[in-house]
Design a protein with these regions (language model features):
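A generic secondary-structure boundary signal that marks alpha-helix termini
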Residues: 20, 127-131, 207
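Bacterial Sec-dependent signal peptides at the C-terminal "C-region" and cleavage site
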Residues: 18-27
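Bacterial N-terminal signal peptides that target proteins for export
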Residues: 1-11
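...with weaker cross-activation on analogous glycine-rich loops/strands in unrelated enzymes
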Residues: 143-237
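N-terminal capping segments
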Residues: 26-170
Length: 287
């Protein structure tokens, strides 16, 4: 169901109070360098739920736990998914995310619609994770970096792809890599075998363009690998979990882990990025 705007703040406040915050030790998530396959019983039957932290945090420590909690925060705004829509020339134009997203209390977007699309939803999780990790960040965020993170121009018009932080995240190709690794240094590239719940991922399809998601895990079914992730897509009516099995539709991926959230206060807003990068083939070992 859709949560009325008047009730969202009280529901989210209660959710944040009642749900314990894991991984407060202030460290990046680490892994052992090998494939991790989650238990298929941890994959919920419901596409929309608020159990990402509860279900998947047992597989990780550190910052990825806050990312998982951030998924629940975004999802709580629209338990029916909120709707999926793309159309930059539509009137009103597309909305990256369907609610008034803020960073440290500073508005990033006045949404023209209540719908969302993939890169907007993953960016929302990134921002909400920063709110959890750096609760006193408002006084440390410079105006030029705040402006770079905004999802609209000052006049409310659409911020174009490749422009500043959000424009790089929203770019075709490996947007999370452009924004988190190259542009800001907030993240680190991770090969597929090291991917863990709470990592950010761009997927290139065999047919079609790509998808920006928050990775939840690899799994094996009938001796074939699959993956589960959270994003906004048409098949889930916006925000929701998607189970992909088998992986025959995936051409390649690019995975990024949040490792230095504090660099949100120091990145160079004029830094350029390299867009032409090869993707990583997903080839788990036979099990």
């Amino acid at each position: 169901m859709r949560i009325p705007p008047s009730a969202q703040s009280s529901i989210l406040a209660a959710f944040l109070t009642l749900t314990p915050l894991f991984g407060q030790s202030g460290k990046a998530t680490v892994d052992n360098g090998t494939w991790l396959f989650i238990d298929t019983t941890d994959i919920p039957a419901s596409r929309q739920h608020l159990n990402h932290e509860a279900l998947f945090s047992k597989y990780v420590e550190g910052y990825n736990r806050q990312v998982l909690k951030a998924i629940d925060i975004v999802q709580a705004h629209a338990m029916d998914g909120g709707g999926y829509f793309t159309g930059m020339h539509a009137k009103p134009t597309e909305s990256p995310i369907g609610y008034k997203l803020t960073l440290f209390g500073k508005p990033l977007l006045d949404p023209p619609r209540t719908t969302s699309y993939c890169s907007g939803s993953s960016y929302g999780v990134f921002i909400e994770a920063l709110n959890l990790l750096l609760p006193e960040g408002s006084s440390r965020l410079s105006e030029e970096r705040y402006e770079s993170l905004r999802m609209q121009e000052p006049d409310g018009s659409r911020r174009e792809d490749r422009i500043k932080f959000w424009g790089k995240w929203n770019d075709d190709g490996w947007g999370t890599h452009y924004a988190m690794v190259q542009y800001s240094g907030i993240g680190e590239e991770i090969p597929p075998e090291r991917a863990r719940p709470g990592d950010f991922m761009n997927i290139a399809w065999v047919k079609g363009l790509g998808h920006s998601v928050v990775f939840l895990g690899w799994f094996v079914k009938k001796n074939q690998p699959g993956m589960v992730f959270w994003s906004s897509q048409k098949s889930t009516n916006g925000y929701g979990d998607l189970v992909l099995w088998p992986l025959t539709s995936v051409k390649s991926v690019k995975t990024v882990r949040m490792t230095h959230p504090e660099r949100i206060f120091s990145f160079d807003v004029l830094r350029e990025v390299v867009r032409e990068l090869p993707g990583d083939t997903v080839a788990p070992p036979n099990r």
